[in-house]
């Protein structure tokens, strides 16, 4: 290994520094093909977008960086009734999935049911975009999400939110990214973030990245994580978890052949050995249903809300717990 590559890997382990070289891509993954796919996705999002409930206001495309993907949407109550205690609204900070190369903050599965359930109860929902493969490596995607978190906390008071009552949430690739940030809070705090309450990871298969990458897997994971074990370790929530990290809930599908619940259970045991709090919520739902059905009136939604309510008395009050 050259000195240059050794320095790069040390930087990744120390702080998830951006890669200077792109991760390997499949031969069919050209910039033109990727852009066409993203355009079709954006068109489908527009076609399927449901109207907002009348008591919800949306603030669209707030920037947290110069790139067009570095944007977030804010969903808040359209009429604000002051809390008798003077407390500001808790915030769910949602990160979409899409294999680290696709997805959008406005997809109905990402926001529709969550917004419809939580915003009328006085919980703000922030939905975040971030830069994607092949242009932006996963290490820098984590930096994007951390910067979005810091910016959202800094601006929260402007739209009625409480910077100290954020709950991180993500699905699939987004669940990996929020788990990684939650595992090592210093990553976001270096960018100006304040402490948050905890995280809900919706069906991530990448809690222990080295273990997953050493087993048979789809090529998309090679595109995202490459072949170097040092890079895997730097992006692995299991290996990056530090004592004192906020609590986490790992929701996992019992319907997937790759059995993400086994990884979630091992992750929870590891967190417990470090003195932390983590719980696993297995669900007989598909990978997509775990995201899309959160917010429906169901035992599943109530179980997630139970974890959220356990983090803070104001959150519990807003959720009616």
Each language-model region and where it sits:
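N-terminal cap/lid segment of alpha/beta-hydrolase-fold proteins
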Residues: 26-84
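Mobile cap/lid helix-loop segments that gate and shape the active-site cleft of serine hydrolases
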Residues: 48-54, 205-240
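Short amphipathic alpha-helix adjacent to the substrate-entry channel of hydrolases
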Residues: 106-126
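Alpha/beta-hydrolase active-site loop
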Residues: 136-157
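Primarily recognizes the serine-hydrolase "nucleophile elbow" in alpha/beta-hydrolase
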Residues: 150-214
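Short beta-strand/loop motif that positions the catalytic acidic residue
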Residues: 244, 250-253
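C-terminal catalytic histidine-bearing segment of alpha/beta-hydrolase fold enzymes
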Residues: 251, 265-268, 272-321
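Conserved alpha/beta-hydrolase "acid-adjacent" motif
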Residues: 257-265
């Amino acid at each position: 290994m050259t000195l240059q590559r050794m320095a790069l890997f040390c930087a990744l382990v120390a702080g998830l520094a951006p890669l200077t070289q792109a991760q390997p891509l499949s031969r069919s993954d050209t910039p033109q093909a990727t852009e066409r796919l993203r355009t079709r996705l954006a068109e489908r999002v527009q076609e399927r977008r449901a109207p907002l409930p009348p008591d919800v206001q949306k603030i669209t495309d707030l920037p947290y960086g110069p790139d067009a993907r570095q944007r977030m949407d804010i969903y808040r109550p359209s009429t604000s009734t002051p809390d008798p205690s003077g407390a500001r609204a808790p915030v769910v900070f949602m990160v979409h999935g899409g294999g680290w190369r696709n997805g959008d903050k406005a997809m109905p599965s990402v926001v529709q049911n969550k917004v419809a359930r939580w915003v009328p109860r006085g919980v703000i929902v922030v939905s975040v975009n971030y830069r994607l493969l092949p242009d932006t490596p996963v290490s820098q995607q984590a930096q994007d999400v951390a910067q979005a978190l810091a910016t959202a906390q800094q601006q929260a008071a402007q739209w009625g939110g409480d910077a100290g009552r954020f709950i991180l949430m993500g699905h699939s690739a987004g669940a990996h990214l929020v788990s990684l940030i939650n595992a090592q809070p210093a990553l976001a705090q270096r960018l100006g973030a304040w402490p948050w309450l905890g995280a809900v990871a919706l069906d991530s298969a990448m809690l222990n990245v080295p273990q997953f990458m050493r087993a048979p897997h789809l090529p998309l994971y090679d595109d995202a994580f490459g072949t170097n074990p040092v890079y895997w370790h730097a992006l692995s929530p299991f290996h990056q978890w530090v004592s004192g990290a906020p609590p986490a809930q790992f929701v996992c599908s019992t319907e997937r052949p790759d059995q993400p619940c086994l990884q979630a259970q091992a992750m929870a045991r590891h967190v417990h050995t470090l003195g932390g709090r983590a719980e696993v919520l297995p669900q007989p739902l598909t990978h997509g249903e775990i995201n899309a059905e959160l917010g429906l009136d169901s035992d599943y939604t109530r179980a997630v809300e139970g974890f959220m309510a356990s983090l803070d008395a104001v959150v519990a009050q807003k959720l009616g717990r």
